[in-house]
């Protein structure tokens, strides 16, 4: 299988086992949900009636006052009382084994190629960490919402992209299923393609 290298008018031979897989929507969905769940903090916490501060004394006697009976100042129906079914910190991550994760990445890359959303460059870099330069570079190739993948983090590219909400820069070890499908296009260097091929083979 061959991919067109845009900036040098050349072709790059890649493995069909990795970049020509069938689209497995169920697998991708499972991996994306698991990845998204693992990014949740899960740190919210509230105090139940057992944990909130306050006296354990009965507010008033059970009978004879004419008021509704009350047994605790910390009751959830009282102001400054505890919370009913108080939320506690919890772990949301889901287990996904390596074979499934790699299979999902292969399927995503294959679909990006089929949809002509994966654009390969021999070299994609900037002379200085300037957002203006990156905006112009993307304008020249008619791209807006784009993920840029390099073999190693290019500092100039990374700094130039930080102020652009529709552009993200990652190295091959930082890519994830959510980022790959979130952007309209993925710009990737030849070195990055070769490295991904090694990782996923």
From Swiss-Prot:
Question: Does this UniProt record's set of keywords contain rRNA-binding?
Answer: yes
UniProt key word Transferase: no
Record key words, sorted:
Ribonucleoprotein, Ribosomal protein, RNA-binding, rRNA-binding
List the PANTHER family.
50S RIBOSOMAL PROTEIN L4, LARGE RIBOSOMAL SUBUNIT PROTEIN UL4M
Could you tell me which HAMAP family the record lists for this protein?
A: Ribosomal_uL4_B
**What does the function comment of this entry state?**
One of the primary rRNA binding proteins, this protein initially binds near the 5'-end of the 23S rRNA. It is important during the early stages of 50S assembly. It makes multiple contacts with different domains of the 23S rRNA in the assembled 50S subunit and ribosome. Forms part of the polypeptide exit tunnel.
Subunit record text: Part of the 50S ribosomal subunit.
Name listed for the protein in its UniProt record: Large ribosomal subunit protein uL4
Organism of provenance: Buchnera aphidicola subsp. Acyrthosiphon pisum (strain 5A)
Instruction: Give me the gene this protein comes from.
Output: rplD
